Amino acid sequence: KAFGHLPSWNPKTRPPVAPLAPLDTVVTRQVSGRVPVAATYFGWRLPVRDTWGFDACDLALSVLGGGQTSRLYRELVRNQQVATAAGASAVPLVGGTSFGIAQVRALPGQDAAEATEAALAEIDRLATDGPTDAEVARAKAQHAREWLTELARFDSRADLISTYATLHDDPERVNRKLDEVMSLTTDRVAEAASAFLRPDQRAQLDYQQEADDA
């Protein structure tokens, strides 16, 4: 009644965005600033969200850097003690290309070169040899816990339902999504890591500590 006089709006359909291929060369950039410690960030192009390729990369990145039982944390922080923190995660995007991130923070007063080299060795090992069945099972359990925690809250559950309604015109998919992830095999995760998470496909950002003038 209040808006009946307004003309209807017929939005144009946005054309699908072609996904970007993985980088074919390493792209690096260095930035200096007054940061607490030196750090290195890695980035990769990943498949669009809600595909088996993205979900498998998400599990692979969880194996690599999801929590204190992950490869990066266990090797760099606990075993070699060359970093104060290390982790990895995936960022899902529906428009063409998602991306994955890994990061390491150096020890206070040191540059990140040693931690970066150790991280690249772990990234290469994952891309070359793949994860173990036990690592994939842990990553799935972690994903399931986070997913069910989100569904247990009415506000985040509503957000997920609206997400699948808006992005895929399929709100019921929220009930199937966990099964899609749980059905991925270790071989599938290894295949995704080899295809999208190799060291030679990365972008790298190095944060260096700026010299103190005092």
Regions found by a protein language model. Give the residues of each.
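Non-catalytic beta-strand/loop surface segments
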Residues: 5-51, 62-114, 135, 139, ...
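Short beta-alpha connecting loops at secondary-structure transitions
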Residues: 102-104, 124-127, 173-178
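Acidic/histidine-enriched segments that form metal/cofactor-coordinating
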Residues: 121, 137-155
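C-terminal, helix-dominated tail/subdomain
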Residues: 162-173, 181
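A common structural junction motif
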Residues: 3-11, 120-131
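Structural motif
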Residues: 49-55, 155
